[in-house]
A protein has these predicted regions:
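Conserved N-terminal phosphate-binding loop of PLP-dependent enzymes in the Aspartate aminotransferase
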Residues: 1-182
Length: 182
């Protein structure tokens, strides 16, 4: 599939002729591409990319700013492919649009980051923290399951419309992260 072709290209073309893997610190991606049209990757792409990163000691960073916090029916979109990133970043959805960011990482990554190495002058905003707590409460009380259920319903309805309307192109998505081409 296309995902295999991309990973093969990275390994056999980019790494072989343009950029040695030992010079690559990390691969950062959106598990479901947001601004590019809600592009859902082929089934084998993320697992193969995870394996490639592991083979070369490259960190895999998941940008879940748009796709995270239950929007796709799972806490994080990358979970649809049973892939665990080394670092995961999120924002927006974690506090229902109130400015707040989140970064989590494997212990093996965090232990290399000394205490005090990361800080800011505007952290701990009480409003953002309350918004995040309420958002997490909603997610834990069925929002994520509802996103999965409603996403299936909407994708099925769009597929039926697509069969009747030739102006509709591709219909794709996970949960409530849905894209339609016209």
């Amino acid at each position: 599939d296309a995902g295999d072709a991309v990973v093969d290209y990275i390994e056999h073309v980019l790494f072989a002729s343009a950029l040695p893997p030992e010079e690559v610190a990390a691969v950062m991606l959106e598990p479901i591409q947001g601004e590019g049209g809600y592009i859902v990757p082929p089934p084998h792409f993320l697992p193969r990319l995870r394996k490639l990163c592991d083979e070369h000691g490259i960190l895999l960073i998941a940008d879940e700013v748009q796709s995270g916090v239950g929007r796709t029916g799972k806490w994080w979109a990358i979970q649809h492919w049973d892939v665990e990133p080394d670092i995961l970043c999120s924002a927006k959805g974690i506090a229902s649009g109130v400015p707040l960011g989140l970064m989590v990482a494997r212990q093996s990554v965090i232990k290399k980051w000394p205490a005090g190495a990361h800080g800011n002058t505007y952290g701990g905003n009480p409003l953002a923290c309350v918004a995040a707590l309420k958002t997490l409460e909603l997610v834990e009380n069925g929002m994520m399951e509802n996103a999965a259920k409603m996403g299936e319903y909407i994708l099925d309805a769009l597929a039926e419309m697509q069969a009747r309307h030739p102006s509709m192109g591709d219909v794709r998505g996970k949960g409530l992260m849905i894209g339609v081409e016209f």
